[in-house]
Structure formats: C-alpha cells, structure tokens
Design a protein with these regions (language model features):
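C-terminal alpha-helical interaction appendages
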Residues: 1-157
Length: 157
C-alpha cells in the first residue's frame, strides 16, 4: 500500500489553520491548498530576491495566500447566529448549526444572490445579505421545529 506524505510547509500550515477557522468547508481541498501555499512561497522568495525585508516579504506572501479568502460565509453565519439567535437557541445548537446551515440549499441560494468579494463585508450589500440570512434562518428554525429558548422563562419551548 502506498501512502503519500503531506509536505510540511509554513505557508501550507498557515493556510490550513486559516481555512479551519474561517472556511471549514474548504479544509480538504488539497489541490487548492498546495497550489496556494506554493504561490505564497514563490511570492516570498521573489520578494526576498528583490531585496525586501523578511517581514515585508511575509506580508506580500500573505496577500497571495489569502487572496479571495477575506469574506467568509462561515463567519457570516456565525455572526448572524450569535447576534440574532443567541437568546433563542441553546448554545450547543448554535455551535452545531453553522456547518449544517452552510450546506443548506436555502442558505446557499441567499449567498448565491451576491458577488462575495474580499471586501464584501464592508459593502452596503452586506447588510442586505445579513438581513436575508436572518429571515432564512428563522424560517429554517420554524419549518424544522428546532428547539428554542423562551427568553422570558429560559425554558425550552
């Protein structure tokens, strides 16, 4: 049996950690991770060869490493759940719900309406997305009968 050994690379490890925290749905995209880590390493080496300092070269490499990864659907869902549903949903459910919602077709159709660029979170469209996601999640909770906490009595409804 042949096994492949994963190459240890600073940029690969850095990207994998970032994806795990902000894009858990992408942590197994090995081709993407390898290519992006290689691009970042090349950018770093090129910057050093051009006379840039090591810290500046790392900044330049990080720009390559995280290109297209500044806006996270996962983080957006976490934000909506924490800000809008913290009192209604028991905490273990909040934590488990994000990856499930990320795969939900209704949630995906909301995200698909928007061009999610790196700077989308600072755009006026972000508020519309946030509001639509909130409404969609309310419907998902109602349709699926998810347990909610009555904020006045703190009991399961």
């Amino acid at each position: 049996m042949t096994t492949t050994k994963k190459e240890l690379s600073y940029f690969r490890l850095k990207l994998e950690a970032y994806l795990g925290e902000h894009f858990p749905e992408r942590v197994n995209e090995n081709t993407f991770i390898t290519a992006r880590a290689d691009e970042a390493l090349t950018a770093y080496c090129d910057a050093i060869a051009q006379g840039f300092s090591h810290p500046k070269a790392e900044v330049m490499a990080s720009e390559v490493l995280y290109q297209g990864l500044h806006f996270s659907k996962y983080n957006t869902l976490v934000s909506v759940l924490e800000n809008e549903f913290e009192k209604e949903l028991p905490s273990p459910l909040l934590e488990r719900l994000t990856p499930i919602l990320l795969k939900n077709k209704a949630v995906q159709s909301v995200f698909d309406k928007y061009e999610l660029t790196d700077d989308f979170g600072a755009s006026p469209e972000y508020e519309k997305l946030y509001t639509e996601l909130t409404g969609t999640i309310v419907l998902i909770i109602e349709v699926n009968g998810l347990p909610t906490v009555d904020s006045e009595n703190m009991t399961l409804m």
